[in-house]
């Protein structure tokens, strides 16, 4: 099978800001904490200063998971790890948009799990718990009611009830 690597900027699917971030452009360095690489994780671990009460989070998670049957041991272990100040979460999330589909969710989740495993190998004295956060209620409809396709903005102008109730589209044909 022939495989060709396509650079992000060649896809014309990412903003110039995203391209600069991925290319570690020093012009944007003042606006971010760290570029994503192993050296950055070493600095983050070294400079962490979180002092919150972890037991509150652990207790709530244990309550939420108590009625789930046949839980994998990894879930129980990860919740337990959160008690320790030697534990970090590796968090990803997703805000709804039109062109990602279910495979993108799976990709993000698997990538986060793999990063947590890789960091555990690199920093064995720490634990890394993968967290997937579904950004379903943190946005305004105006943030997700449009997309760009072939240089044109396509907007869904009607049909918003609330962040937690599905919008009812008007003017669209029945399936």
Regions found by a protein language model. Give the residues of each.
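N-terminal targeting/trafficking signals and adjacent low-complexity tails
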Residues: 1-175
